[in-house]
Amino acid sequence: LGAFAQEQKGVSEVERNYQAGTSPLTTTPMVQSTNPKAPPMSLVEFEAARKIYFERCAGCHGVLRKGATGKPLTPDLTVAKGTDYLKVFIAYGSPAGMPNWQTSGEMDEATVDLMARYIQHDAPTPPEWSLDDTKKTWKVTVAPKDRPTKKMNNFNIENIFSTTLRDTGEIALIDGDTKEIISIIKTGYAVHISRMSASGRYLFVIGRDAKINMIDLWMAKPDSVAEVRIGLEARSVETSKAKGYKDKLVIAGAYWPPQFTIMDGDTLEPKKIVSTRGMVVGTQEYHPEPRVASILGSHYKPEFIVNVKETGKTLMVDYSNLDALKITEIGSAPFLHDGGLDASKRYFMVAANNSNKIAAIDTKDGKLAGLTDVGKIPHPGRGANFTHPQFGPVWSTGHLGDDTISLIGTDPKKFKQYAFKEVAKLKGPGGGALFVKSHPKSKNLWSDAPLNPDPKISQAIVVYDINNLDKGYKTLPIAEWADLKDDGAKRVVQPEYNKAGDEVWFSVWSAKNKESAIVVVDDKTLKLKKVIKDPRLITPTGHFNVYNTQHDVY
């Protein structure tokens, strides 16, 4: 059995790094249950194992251990296997995809024994999160009546960048014109995304701990004016964009509990909570914890487009009457994650990452327009739109699990034969890509690979000429240009254009105790334009240009 397990090649280092991110549930108090059939564990051991589980395992096996992208690990399955059997598979992994935790050096023998016993006990359940719980966290620090009635600063708001400072629980607002930091704002832990109000005045950020901050960019020094926590773990926030509803509502989706919350657009006062627990598309099996992934505000209707990860459903949530909420359910494929609009802003292209598919949601007609196979574990961010010389308008995504970029046709009128199909693959340097990006005024397509284990790949960026894709990519040594003097990881992450579309910004991301930077490149010449260094730029990761985020330009 051990020899067989050692042959496993199911999980790459890239995939393990992506799936095994620390969960905020690590520090959430939970009760140890007793299972008389399970091997004994002290309370201290149980707490240690629970912490490791939420740091390393919950991303694949689920909060309740009932399975997500990985297999279920519930006592009805694990007790019968026995401790010795489980230790082998934790230590050596399996061809089906279990990482080899001990032989990779991630766990020692004692930790493997601890985890083998832990998964034979009943899974501790984190608490639910009600409207009352949400209201207890809701704070309005500057009431709407006390906010400016006009812009009180000289910043070019449309060219401000919101940059996540991942490990400090902050964002940096950076002036895209001067390249100077405007302010550092305290937020939730590890801000996942920044999103704009339809008017462009308010910036909304959400941490992995489900805390939302509402930031007023009209203030003399932009700062948070309201905050709320919508659960225990989350990834997504969005605002209403439809005519007559601009700036009226905000929505956020939680990983735990599996639900979304609709709030007032001026104050973040919670108004409505909707659970996403339900049946998986295709198998029609009940799933107890389907996480809310990406959310988009429709430009066509008063609807939020909510992607539910494990069930593979896209929910078209009509917010015109919260007291009589209407939801249209569109099934595509399990493990829906991130995505963005095509160039026409009609079709929401969303990755079903562990299904290796891209779904195209027609936001105007409210239906599934297409579902196409792509590479291994697509991760587009919001993707990248450009016009291909042969296939017309395409939307593109990179992949975590292979070295390709998939191009998908998005014009069913003029290029019907290519619509919502993978029309081409570009070869990249290696897996581990998180974001691709282009711009309507650019001839370039950019891709990162920060999770690639090879520093030569993770510390660089690749760029393609969209008019000469057959020539392959050029590699730019972004981390080298940053000229950081220590031995940090220097992972280059998330290309982001300025408003004009003539600069591309990159984070050079190292650990909290190492130096990081932001590198700005001239999009036309591909030459270094500016390196932004500041002691306050600690673990910069994602960044979002106000105008491009507000208008879905990517």
Spans of features found by a protein language model:
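Sequence/structural segment immediately N-terminal to covalent heme-attachment motifs in c-type
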Residues: 42-63, 85-92
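Loop/turn-rich, solvent-exposed surfaces of beta-rich toroidal or solenoidal domains
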Residues: 392-397, 403-405, 430-516
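Structural signature of eukaryotic scaffold interfaces centered on beta-propeller domains
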Residues: 138-155, 195-198, 237-246, 285-300, ...
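A short beta-strand motif characteristic of beta-propeller blades
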Residues: 180-185, 221-229, 269-274, 278-285, ...
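Asp-box/WD-like beta-propeller blade repeats and closely related beta-sheet repeat scaffolds
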Residues: 224-312, 323-331, 336
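Extracytoplasmic electron-transfer domains, predominantly the class I c-type cytochrome c fold
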Residues: 7-20, 64, 68, 74-126
